[in-house]
Amino acid sequence: MTNFQEYQEFKDMYDNAKSMLNSSNHTINYYRQNYDKTILNSFYFIVDMPPYIANTLKSKTPKLKLSLDSLLKNMIEHPEITFKEYLQLEYFLYNAEYILLKNEKNLIYFKIDNCLYQFVIKNTKDGCENFLTTFHKTNIKQLNKDIARYKQIKR
């Protein structure tokens, strides 16, 4: 996010998602079945990826998007992730310690203040769009398991 307007638009999306969740204990499937797909598929550009990540994904654009659906899913499954951490995604991407390639998805790990995070980026088949599909805290055991299974792009 490069300016206040972009920040405010993302904060509005985040706050709307949070208010939807505060009123219930539903799973993401509930929202997918009961809300208009055009609303859930709405997205926000959150950051430009480093060129080598975009190239690895065979992406035609460095733009990374986050859909309302993915944000809701992450807020339900990983409530420990704060708004502030979402704002740090650009920093996290550019300072990732490990980047692993799993099929069409990148598994990216980074450590900040002794906390290990993982996020997954997936792009469309035509390479025109990139989406952040998950973002959560993880542990060294999971990182080591994934290092053993997937192609390592960066360390």
Task: Map each language-model feature to its residues.
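Ribonuclease/tRNase effector modules and their secretory precursors
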Residues: 1-155
